[in-house]
């Protein structure tokens, strides 16, 4: 789970994801075992810094979390963000060989959450 923001104060779900979810009585153990949370900030110092697009293209994101680079055989993505970010991410993922799910119900390697996208 990546979360890219400008300022640390915009990491609205950081404490929930890092403190509350792992202690959930029903699925906390799964969160501790499987969830990788990678928050990144662009405009002030933070342990992870930079735009998600740059971190993906450079390979730093996957290197930081200890996973292989993005691969259409093994990876899937759900994206939410500004229209510009989504265009950039689609171009990057397409370049890596992933295919967009054309519509709900049709399989693809990634999908875009469009509920909050303004044009």
Protein language model features and the residues they cover:
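Reductase modules of NAD(P)H-dependent flavoproteins
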Residues: 2, 9-119
């Amino acid at each position: 789970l990546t979360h890219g923001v400008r300022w640390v104060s915009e990491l609205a779900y950081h404490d929930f994801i890092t403190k509350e979810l792992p202690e959930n009585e029903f699925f906390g153990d799964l969160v501790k075992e499987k969830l990788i949370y990678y928050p990144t900030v662009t405009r002030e110092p933070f342990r992870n810094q930079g735009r998600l697009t740059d971190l993906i293209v450079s390979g730093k994101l996957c290197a930081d979390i200890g996973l292989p680079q993005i691969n259409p055989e093994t990876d899937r993505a759900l994206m939410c963000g500004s229209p510009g970010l989504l265009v950039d991410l689609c171009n990057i993922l397409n370049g890596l060989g992933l295919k967009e799910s054309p519509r709900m119900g049709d399989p693809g390697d990634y999908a875009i959450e469009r509920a909050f996208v303004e044009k």
